[in-house]
Design a protein with these regions (language model features):
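Bacterial N-terminal signal peptides that target proteins for export
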Residues: 2-14
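Bacterial N-terminal signal peptides
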Residues: 12-22
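Intrinsically disordered, low-complexity basic tails and flexible linkers associated
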Residues: 24-27
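Sequence context surrounding c-type heme c attachment/ligation sites in exported
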Residues: 29-153
Length: 153
């Protein structure tokens, strides 16, 4: 004997399917949102290079500082699609973000030039400016960036 589906049963089935689809979609979004962006890899490499410079300065290995400085000044950039997402999020602060990057570039370039001359004091001064530029950018953007692209932690 067959029973015709009543409206309530149909509604329950439709609602269950809709909730399952929505939950699956949200799960996929949260995984995508926590997937590391290319910028994270760039920042990790910059961190390693800055640590290597610190070690080289402590040993007065100016040739190594001269080798590392351009890697910091002309660091890799994320792919264009990621840059567009970041710039869209930055909005009117995009100029400030670019200025921070420009300051890092200029200070790291000066550090490399000083290292080539063997001018330890100038290397340390330029390294300090490089580090201060990194810190200014991180203090201005890191927390809100992480919240925007990785969720609150």
């Amino acid at each position: 004997m067959s029973h015709p589906l009543n409206t309530r049963s149909l509604f329950t089935v439709a609602l269950s399917v809709a909730l399952a689809i929505t939950a699956t979609g949200l799960g996929a979004q949260s995984v995508e949102a926590t997937k590391p962006m290319a910028l994270r890899t760039v920042m990790e490499k910059l961190g390693r290079d800055m640590q290597a410079v610190t070690g080289a300065i402590s040993k007065e290995e100016w040739a190594l500082v001269a080798e590392l400085a351009p890697k910091i000044a002309k660091h890799a950039e994320p792919p264009l699609s990621e840059k567009m997402r970041i710039l869209g999020w930055l909005g009117t602060d995009a100029g400030k973000f670019r200025d921070c990057d420009g300051h890092v570039h200029d200070a790291a370039t000066a550090m490399g030039d000083a290292a080539k001359r063997g001018d330890g004091q100038a290397v340390i001064t330029a390294f300090s400016k490089t580090q201060q530029s990194c810190l200014a950018c991180h203090q201005s953007f890191r927390q809100s960036f992480v919240e925007q692209f990785y969720g609150k932690r």
